[in-house]
Amino acid sequence: MNCKEYIEHIRDELKGSMSYYWKAKEAKKDNDTEAFKYFSKLAVDEYEHAGVLFKMLDEHIKKKTADDKYEGVYKDLYEMSIEVLREEYKETEDLIKKA
C-alpha cells in the first residue's frame, strides 16, 4: 500500500467504528443487550484495526521519506492528512470509552 491507500483505509476503519458505535448506542437505548454487545465489539475492532494501520503507515513513511519523491510538498501533505486522521482517531477513542 502507498500512503494514500493507508490514509483511505484508516479513514474507512474510523467511519466503520463510528457507525457501529451509533448502532450500539441505539441498541443500548432500546435495551437490546445482545445487539449492544455485538455492535460495541465491532466498533472496538474497527478502532483497533485503525490503530494497527497507523503503526504500519508510520513505518511506511519512515522508509519512504528517504526517497526524493516523498520529500517536500508530498511529505507535508501526507503529514497534514495524518494529523487530521489522528484527531478523528482520538475522537473515536473518546466516544468508544464513553459507551
Regions found by a protein language model. Give the residues of each.
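Non-heme di-metal
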Residues: 1-99
